[in-house]
Amino acid sequence: MSQFHPVKYHQSLGDAFYDRVAPAPFPKTILRHRDQRWAARLGIENLSDEQWIAHFGRFEPFPGSFETPLALRYHGHQFRSYNPDLGDGRGFLFAQAIDLADGRLLDMATKGSGRTPWSRGADGRLTLKGGVREILATEMLEALGVNTSKSLSLVETGEELERGDEPSPTRGSVLVRLSHSHIRIGTFQRLAYLEEPENIAQLLDYAIEHYYPELVDAADKPAAFLEAVVDRVATMGAQWIAAGFVHGVLNTDNINITGESFDYGPWRFLPTYDPNFTAAYFDETGLYSFGRQPEALAWNLTRLAECLVPLSSVEALEPALNTVWPKFRAALPAALLRRLGLQPLGSDSDTAFVNALFTFMLASQTPYEQFFFDWRGGALGAERAARSPAAAHYASETFRPVADALEAYGPAENLNLDHPYFTRERPRTMLIDEVEAIWAPIAQSDDWSGLHLALAEIAEMREAYGVKP
Protein backbone atom coordinates (compact mmCIF):
# COMPACT_ATOMS: atom_id res chain seq x y z
CA MET A 1 0.00 0.00 0.00
CA SER A 2 3.08 2.19 -0.15
CA GLN A 3 1.94 3.91 -3.34
CA PHE A 4 -1.62 4.60 -2.18
CA HIS A 5 -2.21 8.33 -2.59
CA PRO A 6 -5.33 9.45 -0.70
CA VAL A 7 -6.65 12.98 -1.06
CA LYS A 8 -9.51 14.96 0.48
CA TYR A 9 -10.45 17.28 -2.36
CA HIS A 10 -14.24 16.99 -2.06
CA GLN A 11 -14.10 17.99 1.58
CA SER A 12 -12.74 21.38 0.48
CA LEU A 13 -16.14 22.28 -0.98
CA GLY A 14 -17.48 22.75 2.53
CA ASP A 15 -20.48 21.69 4.56
CA ALA A 16 -23.00 23.22 2.15
CA PHE A 17 -22.33 20.31 -0.21
CA TYR A 18 -22.52 17.28 2.08
CA ASP A 19 -23.38 15.92 5.51
CA ARG A 20 -20.87 14.09 7.69
CA VAL A 21 -22.31 10.68 8.53
CA ALA A 22 -21.39 7.43 10.24
CA PRO A 23 -21.49 3.99 8.60
CA ALA A 24 -24.00 1.46 9.87
CA PRO A 25 -22.65 -1.33 12.10
CA PHE A 26 -23.28 -4.69 10.47
CA PRO A 27 -23.73 -8.01 12.30
CA LYS A 28 -21.36 -9.74 9.87
CA THR A 29 -18.87 -8.71 7.19
CA ILE A 30 -18.28 -11.44 4.62
CA LEU A 31 -16.09 -10.49 1.66
CA ARG A 32 -17.78 -11.54 -1.57
CA HIS A 33 -15.91 -9.57 -4.24
CA ARG A 34 -12.76 -7.49 -4.52
CA ASP A 35 -11.56 -6.11 -7.85
CA GLN A 36 -7.81 -6.61 -7.82
CA ARG A 37 -7.29 -4.90 -11.19
CA TRP A 38 -8.66 -1.63 -9.92
CA ALA A 39 -7.24 -2.10 -6.44
CA ALA A 40 -3.83 -2.07 -8.15
CA ARG A 41 -4.69 1.24 -9.81
CA LEU A 42 -5.15 2.63 -6.30
CA GLY A 43 -2.16 0.87 -4.74
CA ILE A 44 -4.27 -1.20 -2.32
CA GLU A 45 -4.03 -4.59 -4.00
CA ASN A 46 -1.84 -5.98 -1.21
CA LEU A 47 -4.36 -5.42 1.56
CA SER A 48 -5.21 -8.64 3.37
CA ASP A 49 -8.86 -9.67 3.35
CA GLU A 50 -9.06 -8.58 6.99
CA GLN A 51 -7.69 -5.14 6.15
CA TRP A 52 -10.01 -4.93 3.15
CA ILE A 53 -13.06 -5.65 5.30
CA ALA A 54 -11.89 -3.12 7.88
CA HIS A 55 -11.94 -0.39 5.23
CA PHE A 56 -14.77 -1.56 2.96
CA GLY A 57 -17.02 -3.38 5.44
CA ARG A 58 -16.58 -1.37 8.64
CA PHE A 59 -15.36 1.77 6.85
CA GLU A 60 -12.40 2.51 9.03
CA PRO A 61 -10.80 5.52 7.31
CA PHE A 62 -7.57 5.23 5.36
CA PRO A 63 -4.70 7.30 6.78
CA GLY A 64 -4.81 10.70 5.11
CA SER A 65 -8.40 10.27 3.93
CA PHE A 66 -11.72 11.66 5.17
CA GLU A 67 -12.06 11.29 8.93
CA THR A 68 -15.81 10.77 8.49
CA PRO A 69 -17.74 9.81 5.34
CA LEU A 70 -19.62 12.46 3.36
CA ALA A 71 -23.26 11.97 2.30
CA LEU A 72 -23.53 14.20 -0.76
CA ARG A 73 -26.40 16.60 -1.30
CA TYR A 74 -28.26 16.83 -4.61
CA HIS A 75 -31.72 17.17 -6.13
CA GLY A 76 -33.04 15.78 -9.39
CA HIS A 77 -35.78 15.25 -11.92
CA GLN A 78 -37.23 11.77 -11.49
CA PHE A 79 -39.15 10.80 -14.61
CA ARG A 80 -39.15 14.56 -15.29
CA SER A 81 -40.77 15.53 -11.98
CA TYR A 82 -38.52 17.65 -9.80
CA ASN A 83 -37.66 16.22 -6.38
CA PRO A 84 -35.89 18.50 -3.88
CA ASP A 85 -35.69 15.75 -1.23
CA LEU A 86 -32.90 13.66 -2.73
CA GLY A 87 -29.29 13.13 -1.71
CA ASP A 88 -27.13 10.16 -0.73
CA GLY A 89 -29.81 8.15 1.05
CA ARG A 90 -27.96 4.83 1.39
CA GLY A 91 -24.39 5.72 0.62
CA PHE A 92 -21.60 8.19 1.11
CA LEU A 93 -18.29 9.31 -0.33
CA PHE A 94 -15.81 7.30 1.73
CA ALA A 95 -12.46 8.20 0.21
CA GLN A 96 -10.68 9.76 -2.76
CA ALA A 97 -7.34 8.73 -4.22
CA ILE A 98 -5.17 9.31 -7.25
CA ASP A 99 -5.19 6.68 -10.01
CA LEU A 100 -1.58 5.52 -10.13
CA ALA A 101 -1.79 4.76 -13.86
CA ASP A 102 -3.03 8.09 -15.21
CA GLY A 103 -3.00 10.54 -12.31
CA ARG A 104 -6.75 11.13 -12.39
CA LEU A 105 -8.91 11.47 -9.30
CA LEU A 106 -10.96 8.44 -8.25
CA ASP A 107 -13.82 8.45 -5.74
CA MET A 108 -14.66 5.50 -3.52
CA ALA A 109 -18.35 5.70 -2.66
CA THR A 110 -20.75 3.27 -1.08
CA LYS A 111 -24.15 1.80 -1.70
CA GLY A 112 -25.94 0.21 1.25
CA SER A 113 -23.80 1.66 4.06
CA GLY A 114 -26.70 2.82 6.23
CA ARG A 115 -29.09 5.67 6.83
CA THR A 116 -28.22 9.31 6.19
CA PRO A 117 -30.20 12.55 6.53
CA TRP A 118 -31.41 11.83 2.98
CA SER A 119 -32.79 8.31 3.50
CA ARG A 120 -36.41 9.53 3.45
CA GLY A 121 -37.61 6.76 5.75
CA ALA A 122 -35.78 3.96 3.92
CA ASP A 123 -33.36 1.59 5.63
CA GLY A 124 -30.23 2.77 3.81
CA ARG A 125 -29.34 -0.77 2.81
CA LEU A 126 -28.54 -2.63 -0.41
CA THR A 127 -29.69 -6.16 -1.13
CA LEU A 128 -27.03 -8.72 -1.92
CA LYS A 129 -28.77 -9.36 -5.22
CA GLY A 130 -28.53 -5.64 -6.02
CA GLY A 131 -24.81 -5.75 -5.32
CA VAL A 132 -24.30 -8.80 -7.52
CA ARG A 133 -26.27 -7.14 -10.32
CA GLU A 134 -24.10 -4.03 -10.11
CA ILE A 135 -20.91 -6.08 -10.36
CA LEU A 136 -22.26 -7.82 -13.46
CA ALA A 137 -23.35 -4.53 -15.06
CA THR A 138 -20.07 -2.71 -14.51
CA GLU A 139 -17.88 -5.65 -15.54
CA MET A 140 -19.90 -6.33 -18.67
CA LEU A 141 -20.06 -2.70 -19.75
CA GLU A 142 -16.34 -2.20 -19.24
CA ALA A 143 -15.64 -5.24 -21.43
CA LEU A 144 -17.94 -3.81 -24.12
CA GLY A 145 -16.03 -0.53 -24.16
CA VAL A 146 -18.51 1.60 -22.22
CA ASN A 147 -17.35 4.35 -19.87
CA THR A 148 -18.59 3.06 -16.53
CA SER A 149 -18.05 3.18 -12.81
CA LYS A 150 -16.39 0.09 -11.33
CA SER A 151 -17.49 -2.25 -8.54
CA LEU A 152 -14.45 -2.31 -6.28
CA SER A 153 -15.86 -4.32 -3.38
CA LEU A 154 -18.92 -6.23 -2.20
CA VAL A 155 -19.32 -7.29 1.42
CA GLU A 156 -22.28 -9.28 2.69
CA THR A 157 -23.58 -7.78 5.93
CA GLY A 158 -25.49 -10.61 7.60
CA GLU A 159 -28.70 -8.58 7.62
CA GLU A 160 -32.11 -9.70 6.38
CA LEU A 161 -33.89 -6.99 4.41
CA GLU A 162 -37.51 -6.52 3.44
CA ARG A 163 -38.17 -5.40 -0.12
CA GLY A 164 -41.39 -5.06 -2.05
CA ASP A 165 -39.88 -5.87 -5.44
CA GLU A 166 -38.05 -9.13 -4.65
CA PRO A 167 -38.64 -12.17 -2.42
CA SER A 168 -38.13 -11.17 1.22
CA PRO A 169 -36.48 -11.39 3.60
CA THR A 170 -33.40 -11.09 1.42
CA ARG A 171 -29.72 -10.83 2.25
CA GLY A 172 -28.01 -7.46 2.69
CA SER A 173 -24.72 -6.12 1.35
CA VAL A 174 -22.60 -3.01 1.03
CA LEU A 175 -20.95 -2.11 -2.28
CA VAL A 176 -18.02 0.22 -2.88
CA ARG A 177 -18.06 1.91 -6.26
CA LEU A 178 -15.18 3.58 -8.07
CA SER A 179 -15.95 6.56 -10.26
CA HIS A 180 -13.92 9.59 -11.23
CA SER A 181 -16.68 11.80 -9.88
CA HIS A 182 -19.90 11.67 -7.91
CA ILE A 183 -21.00 15.13 -8.98
CA ARG A 184 -24.32 14.77 -10.74
CA ILE A 185 -26.43 17.08 -12.84
CA GLY A 186 -28.66 17.02 -9.76
CA THR A 187 -25.80 18.45 -7.67
CA PHE A 188 -25.94 21.61 -9.77
CA GLN A 189 -29.75 21.56 -9.77
CA ARG A 190 -29.90 21.70 -5.99
CA LEU A 191 -27.77 24.85 -5.90
CA ALA A 192 -29.83 26.48 -8.65
CA TYR A 193 -33.05 25.57 -6.81
CA LEU A 194 -31.69 27.15 -3.61
CA GLU A 195 -30.56 30.21 -5.61
CA GLU A 196 -26.92 29.92 -4.55
CA PRO A 197 -24.90 31.23 -7.52
CA GLU A 198 -21.75 31.51 -5.40
CA ASN A 199 -21.89 27.82 -4.65
CA ILE A 200 -22.62 27.01 -8.30
CA ALA A 201 -19.46 28.94 -9.19
CA GLN A 202 -17.49 27.07 -6.52
CA LEU A 203 -18.74 23.70 -7.76
CA LEU A 204 -17.96 24.65 -11.35
CA ASP A 205 -14.41 25.64 -10.42
CA TYR A 206 -13.96 22.37 -8.51
CA ALA A 207 -15.25 20.32 -11.45
CA ILE A 208 -12.98 22.08 -13.91
CA GLU A 209 -9.92 21.82 -11.67
CA HIS A 210 -10.30 18.09 -11.06
CA TYR A 211 -12.14 16.72 -14.12
CA TYR A 212 -11.66 19.21 -16.94
CA PRO A 213 -8.32 20.94 -16.22
CA GLU A 214 -7.95 21.84 -19.89
CA LEU A 215 -10.72 24.42 -19.32
CA VAL A 216 -8.99 26.35 -16.54
CA ASP A 217 -8.15 29.24 -18.85
CA ALA A 218 -11.37 29.17 -20.91
CA ALA A 219 -12.83 32.59 -21.67
CA ASP A 220 -16.34 31.43 -20.76
CA LYS A 221 -15.93 28.60 -18.27
CA PRO A 222 -19.64 27.72 -17.92
CA ALA A 223 -20.08 27.36 -21.69
CA ALA A 224 -16.83 25.45 -22.10
CA PHE A 225 -17.73 23.15 -19.21
CA LEU A 226 -21.20 22.51 -20.63
CA GLU A 227 -19.78 21.59 -24.03
CA ALA A 228 -17.26 19.23 -22.43
CA VAL A 229 -19.96 17.48 -20.38
CA VAL A 230 -22.18 17.28 -23.47
CA ASP A 231 -19.36 15.54 -25.31
CA ARG A 232 -18.78 12.99 -22.53
CA VAL A 233 -22.47 12.25 -21.98
CA ALA A 234 -23.28 11.99 -25.70
CA THR A 235 -20.38 9.56 -26.10
CA MET A 236 -21.65 7.49 -23.18
CA GLY A 237 -25.13 7.37 -24.73
CA ALA A 238 -23.70 6.16 -28.04
CA GLN A 239 -21.70 3.50 -26.21
CA TRP A 240 -24.90 2.26 -24.53
CA ILE A 241 -26.58 1.87 -27.91
CA ALA A 242 -23.57 0.01 -29.31
CA ALA A 243 -23.57 -2.30 -26.28
CA GLY A 244 -27.33 -2.90 -26.43
CA PHE A 245 -27.65 -1.55 -22.90
CA VAL A 246 -30.70 -0.03 -21.21
CA HIS A 247 -29.91 1.91 -18.04
CA GLY A 248 -33.52 2.05 -16.95
CA VAL A 249 -33.69 5.18 -14.79
CA LEU A 250 -32.14 8.21 -16.50
CA ASN A 251 -33.09 10.78 -13.89
CA THR A 252 -30.88 13.86 -13.60
CA ASP A 253 -29.54 12.67 -10.26
CA ASN A 254 -28.23 9.54 -12.01
CA ILE A 255 -26.10 11.40 -14.58
CA ASN A 256 -22.47 11.98 -13.69
CA ILE A 257 -20.72 15.08 -15.07
CA THR A 258 -17.79 12.90 -16.19
CA GLY A 259 -19.99 10.83 -18.50
CA GLU A 260 -19.51 7.60 -16.55
CA SER A 261 -22.42 5.18 -16.28
CA PHE A 262 -23.44 4.68 -12.68
CA ASP A 263 -26.41 4.34 -10.32
CA TYR A 264 -27.42 0.99 -11.76
CA GLY A 265 -30.91 -0.14 -10.85
CA PRO A 266 -33.17 -2.17 -13.16
CA TRP A 267 -30.66 -2.27 -16.05
CA ARG A 268 -30.91 -4.80 -18.85
CA PHE A 269 -29.22 -5.74 -22.10
CA LEU A 270 -31.25 -6.17 -25.28
CA PRO A 271 -31.93 -9.72 -26.45
CA THR A 272 -32.63 -8.37 -29.96
CA TYR A 273 -32.88 -4.86 -31.36
CA ASP A 274 -36.02 -3.13 -30.09
CA PRO A 275 -36.10 0.66 -29.72
CA ASN A 276 -39.08 0.35 -27.36
CA PHE A 277 -37.43 -2.08 -24.95
CA THR A 278 -37.57 -0.88 -21.32
CA ALA A 279 -35.65 -2.12 -18.30
CA ALA A 280 -37.86 -0.82 -15.49
CA TYR A 281 -41.32 -2.30 -14.90
CA PHE A 282 -42.42 1.11 -13.60
CA ASP A 283 -41.41 2.92 -16.82
CA GLU A 284 -44.96 2.65 -18.10
CA THR A 285 -44.62 5.24 -20.87
CA GLY A 286 -41.23 4.05 -22.13
CA LEU A 287 -39.61 7.38 -21.26
CA TYR A 288 -36.26 5.67 -20.71
CA SER A 289 -36.61 2.93 -23.32
CA PHE A 290 -33.58 1.80 -25.33
CA GLY A 291 -34.28 4.04 -28.32
CA ARG A 292 -35.17 7.10 -26.24
CA GLN A 293 -32.02 7.11 -24.12
CA PRO A 294 -30.30 9.79 -26.25
CA GLU A 295 -33.41 11.97 -25.93
CA ALA A 296 -33.38 11.50 -22.15
CA LEU A 297 -29.71 12.44 -21.92
CA ALA A 298 -30.28 15.53 -24.08
CA TRP A 299 -33.16 16.59 -21.81
CA ASN A 300 -30.96 16.16 -18.76
CA LEU A 301 -28.16 18.20 -20.30
CA THR A 302 -30.62 21.01 -20.90
CA ARG A 303 -31.31 21.00 -17.16
CA LEU A 304 -27.57 21.35 -16.52
CA ALA A 305 -27.43 24.30 -18.90
CA GLU A 306 -30.24 26.00 -16.98
CA CYS A 307 -28.22 25.72 -13.78
CA LEU A 308 -25.28 27.53 -15.39
CA VAL A 309 -27.27 30.52 -16.65
CA PRO A 310 -26.60 32.58 -13.46
CA LEU A 311 -22.88 32.35 -14.25
CA SER A 312 -23.20 33.04 -17.97
CA SER A 313 -26.16 33.72 -20.27
CA VAL A 314 -28.65 31.79 -22.35
CA GLU A 315 -27.04 33.16 -25.50
CA ALA A 316 -23.57 32.00 -24.44
CA LEU A 317 -24.72 28.53 -23.38
CA GLU A 318 -27.00 27.74 -26.32
CA PRO A 319 -24.21 26.95 -28.82
CA ALA A 320 -22.75 24.36 -26.43
CA LEU A 321 -26.16 22.84 -25.77
CA ASN A 322 -26.89 22.72 -29.49
CA THR A 323 -23.96 20.35 -29.96
CA VAL A 324 -25.80 17.51 -28.16
CA TRP A 325 -27.35 15.88 -31.22
CA PRO A 326 -24.43 16.47 -33.62
CA LYS A 327 -22.09 14.94 -31.04
CA PHE A 328 -24.35 11.93 -30.54
CA ARG A 329 -24.80 11.42 -34.29
CA ALA A 330 -21.01 11.44 -34.67
CA ALA A 331 -20.41 9.24 -31.63
CA LEU A 332 -22.89 6.50 -32.57
CA PRO A 333 -21.21 5.28 -35.80
CA ALA A 334 -17.84 5.54 -34.06
CA ALA A 335 -19.06 3.37 -31.16
CA LEU A 336 -20.65 0.76 -33.43
CA LEU A 337 -17.60 0.55 -35.69
CA ARG A 338 -15.32 0.29 -32.66
CA ARG A 339 -17.35 -2.68 -31.46
CA LEU A 340 -16.92 -4.28 -34.87
CA GLY A 341 -13.22 -3.46 -35.01
CA LEU A 342 -13.54 -1.40 -38.20
CA GLN A 343 -11.99 1.83 -39.43
CA PRO A 344 -14.49 4.65 -40.13
CA LEU A 345 -14.93 5.66 -43.77
CA GLY A 346 -16.46 9.10 -43.24
CA SER A 347 -19.65 10.64 -41.91
CA ASP A 348 -22.01 9.92 -44.83
CA SER A 349 -20.86 6.33 -45.37
CA ASP A 350 -20.83 5.63 -41.65
CA THR A 351 -24.33 7.04 -41.16
CA ALA A 352 -25.62 4.95 -44.06
CA PHE A 353 -24.08 1.86 -42.47
CA VAL A 354 -25.78 2.57 -39.13
CA ASN A 355 -29.15 2.95 -40.86
CA ALA A 356 -28.68 -0.29 -42.82
CA LEU A 357 -27.53 -2.12 -39.70
CA PHE A 358 -30.52 -1.16 -37.55
CA THR A 359 -32.95 -1.81 -40.41
CA PHE A 360 -31.54 -5.33 -40.66
CA MET A 361 -31.45 -5.87 -36.89
CA LEU A 362 -35.08 -4.83 -36.50
CA ALA A 363 -36.32 -6.91 -39.44
CA SER A 364 -34.31 -10.05 -38.66
CA GLN A 365 -34.29 -9.94 -34.85
CA THR A 366 -30.76 -11.31 -34.89
CA PRO A 367 -29.49 -11.63 -31.30
CA TYR A 368 -27.89 -8.27 -30.60
CA GLU A 369 -24.57 -9.31 -29.11
CA GLN A 370 -24.28 -12.27 -31.48
CA PHE A 371 -24.10 -9.93 -34.48
CA PHE A 372 -21.20 -7.91 -33.10
CA PHE A 373 -19.39 -11.09 -32.09
CA ASP A 374 -19.92 -12.74 -35.49
CA TRP A 375 -18.78 -9.76 -37.54
CA ARG A 376 -15.85 -8.57 -35.45
CA GLY A 377 -13.31 -7.52 -38.05
CA GLY A 378 -15.94 -7.05 -40.78
CA ALA A 379 -15.17 -9.26 -43.76
CA LEU A 380 -12.53 -11.02 -41.64
CA GLY A 381 -15.39 -12.41 -39.57
CA ALA A 382 -17.18 -14.07 -42.50
CA GLU A 383 -16.02 -17.56 -41.56
CA ARG A 384 -17.07 -17.07 -37.95
CA ALA A 385 -20.43 -15.70 -39.07
CA ALA A 386 -20.97 -18.69 -41.38
CA ARG A 387 -20.84 -21.12 -38.46
CA SER A 388 -22.85 -18.84 -36.16
CA PRO A 389 -26.25 -19.83 -34.75
CA ALA A 390 -27.45 -16.66 -36.51
CA ALA A 391 -26.01 -17.66 -39.92
CA ALA A 392 -29.43 -17.96 -41.54
CA HIS A 393 -30.06 -14.27 -40.89
CA TYR A 394 -26.92 -13.37 -42.83
CA ALA A 395 -28.22 -15.17 -45.93
CA SER A 396 -31.31 -12.95 -46.12
CA GLU A 397 -31.87 -10.12 -48.59
CA THR A 398 -32.21 -7.62 -45.74
CA PHE A 399 -28.61 -8.37 -44.81
CA ARG A 400 -27.23 -7.54 -48.27
CA PRO A 401 -26.73 -3.76 -47.63
CA VAL A 402 -24.97 -4.57 -44.36
CA ALA A 403 -22.78 -7.20 -46.05
CA ASP A 404 -21.79 -4.73 -48.76
CA ALA A 405 -20.89 -2.13 -46.15
CA LEU A 406 -18.86 -4.61 -44.13
CA GLU A 407 -16.86 -5.44 -47.27
CA ALA A 408 -16.04 -1.75 -47.71
CA TYR A 409 -14.63 -1.22 -44.22
CA GLY A 410 -11.04 -1.97 -43.36
CA PRO A 411 -10.18 -3.66 -40.07
CA ALA A 412 -8.76 -1.70 -37.17
CA GLU A 413 -5.28 -2.49 -35.92
CA ASN A 414 -4.56 -5.11 -33.27
CA LEU A 415 -7.90 -6.91 -33.58
CA ASN A 416 -6.63 -10.02 -31.82
CA LEU A 417 -9.01 -12.26 -33.80
CA ASP A 418 -6.93 -15.33 -32.98
CA HIS A 419 -7.88 -14.98 -29.31
CA PRO A 420 -9.58 -18.15 -27.98
CA TYR A 421 -12.69 -16.11 -27.19
CA PHE A 422 -13.47 -15.89 -30.91
CA THR A 423 -13.53 -19.68 -31.26
CA ARG A 424 -16.74 -19.77 -29.24
CA GLU A 425 -20.05 -20.36 -30.97
CA ARG A 426 -21.82 -17.71 -28.91
CA PRO A 427 -20.53 -14.61 -27.14
CA ARG A 428 -20.73 -14.03 -23.41
CA THR A 429 -23.99 -12.16 -22.79
CA MET A 430 -25.74 -10.86 -19.71
CA LEU A 431 -29.45 -11.09 -20.44
CA ILE A 432 -31.95 -11.01 -17.59
CA ASP A 433 -32.40 -14.80 -17.49
CA GLU A 434 -28.63 -15.22 -17.24
CA VAL A 435 -28.48 -12.76 -14.36
CA GLU A 436 -31.23 -14.68 -12.57
CA ALA A 437 -29.41 -17.96 -13.22
CA ILE A 438 -26.28 -16.53 -11.58
CA TRP A 439 -28.25 -15.26 -8.59
CA ALA A 440 -30.44 -18.32 -7.95
CA PRO A 441 -27.71 -20.66 -6.59
CA ILE A 442 -26.35 -17.84 -4.42
CA ALA A 443 -29.79 -17.32 -2.91
CA GLN A 444 -30.60 -21.01 -2.58
CA SER A 445 -27.34 -22.60 -1.47
CA ASP A 446 -24.70 -19.85 -1.19
CA ASP A 447 -23.10 -21.18 -4.37
CA TRP A 448 -21.00 -18.41 -5.93
CA SER A 449 -19.46 -20.52 -8.69
CA GLY A 450 -21.82 -19.12 -11.34
CA LEU A 451 -20.75 -15.56 -10.58
CA HIS A 452 -17.08 -16.50 -10.59
CA LEU A 453 -17.47 -18.27 -13.94
CA ALA A 454 -19.34 -15.30 -15.43
CA LEU A 455 -16.63 -12.88 -14.27
CA ALA A 456 -13.92 -15.14 -15.72
CA GLU A 457 -15.71 -15.23 -19.07
CA ILE A 458 -16.20 -11.46 -19.04
CA ALA A 459 -12.49 -11.07 -18.29
CA GLU A 460 -11.72 -13.27 -21.31
CA MET A 461 -13.99 -11.11 -23.46
CA ARG A 462 -12.37 -7.93 -22.14
CA GLU A 463 -8.95 -9.34 -23.03
CA ALA A 464 -10.12 -10.40 -26.49
CA TYR A 465 -11.45 -6.92 -27.18
CA GLY A 466 -8.26 -5.32 -25.90
CA VAL A 467 -9.98 -3.27 -23.20
CA LYS A 468 -7.45 -1.94 -20.70
CA PRO A 469 -8.36 -1.12 -17.09
Predicted feature descriptions by range:
Residues 28-31, 37-47, 58-219, 258-260, ...:
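Conserved ATP-binding subdomain of kinase catalytic cores across diverse folds
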Residues 22-24, 123-125, 223-224:
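Short, contiguous strand/loop micro-motifs
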Residues 8-14, 106-117, 204-208, 272-282, ...:
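Active-site-adjacent bridging/hinge elements
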Residues 249-250, 255:
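Hydrophobic HxD+1 residue recognition
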Residues 52, 154-155, 253:
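Residue-level "edge-of-site" marker
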Residues 131, 161-247, 258-347, 351:
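ATP-dependent phospho-/nucleotidyl transfer catalytic cores
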Residues 1-73, 279, 284-469:
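Regulatory N- and C-terminal appendages and interdomain linkers associated
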